[in-house]
């Protein structure tokens, strides 16, 4: 009982702290924020100044909500072009959650859609209006290659453990790694370590390869 009371008091304290901060607009989200989500948000926005962060909460602790909070923040700061790369099966789920929880419109893109109106999509991605693209890992790389003059402001990679073998795995991971260099990003995964520490090395390298250096280190 005491533990629950302390948790409630801490939660109220963190909410009051948020209300008095420059991030008060986040309280408009249609969700009840937990203290660990607010802490993750505050840590992440600081980490974005140096490249980004890997959010590795366990399943069910709300990594998607944390990502939505961070996305709201970067949009508030003026980000225009956002790319959300994930398994194809999660595209619709992300589109719905961004709208239902944060009132953020997003667009699911795939190859047939872009091929049909390539010049129109190029225009939409290069003008000064906000656009949030949800797409698969594979097509995210193809999209970035196709429109190389598009300057992405922010990238979210969900289920990022699928890309852990960036230096000795599939071209999918390597391509996204190379194309996303220098772009602020967050990686979401519940399993940052699946086999060995090299898994973590691969994920961290998406943020900054200098942190761990080579795999041998």
What feature does the model see in each segment?
Residues 183-196:
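Conserved helicase ATPase motor motifs in RecA-like P-loop NTPase domains
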Residues 2-42, 63-66, 75-172, 181-182, ...:
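SF2 helicase/translocase NTPase motor core
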Residues 52-56, 83, 186:
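Short hydrophobic/aromatic beta-strand immediately N-terminal to the Walker A/P-loop
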Residues 50-70, 160:
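Walker A/P-loop
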């Amino acid at each position: 009982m005491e533990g629950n009371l302390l948790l409630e008091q801490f939660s109220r304290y963190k909410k009051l702290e948020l209300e008095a901060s420059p991030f008060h607009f986040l309280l408009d989200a249609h969700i009840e924020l937990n203290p660990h989500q607010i802490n993750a948000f505050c840590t992440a926005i600081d980490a974005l100044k140096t490249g980004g962060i890997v959010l590795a909460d366990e399943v069910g602790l709300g990594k998607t909500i944390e990502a939505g909070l961070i996305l709201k923040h970067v949009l508030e700061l003026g980000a225009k072009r956002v790319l959300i790369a994930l398994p194809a099966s999660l595209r619709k789920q992300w589109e719905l959650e961004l709208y239902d929880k944060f009132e953020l419109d997003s667009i699911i893109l795939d190859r047939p859609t872009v091929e049909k109106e390539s010049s129109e999509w190029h225009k939409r991605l290069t003008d000064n209006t906000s656009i949030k693209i949800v797409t698969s890992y594979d097509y995210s790389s193809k999209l970035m290659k196709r429109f190389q003059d598009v300057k992405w402001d922010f990238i979210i990679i969900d289920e990022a453990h699928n890309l852990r073998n960036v230096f000795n795995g599939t071209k999918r991971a390597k391509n996204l790694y190379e194309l996303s260099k220098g772009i602020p990003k967050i990686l979401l995964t519940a399993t940052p370590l699946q086999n060995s520490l090299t898994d973590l090395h691969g994920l961290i390298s998406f943020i900054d390869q200098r942190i761990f250096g080579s795999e041998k280190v």
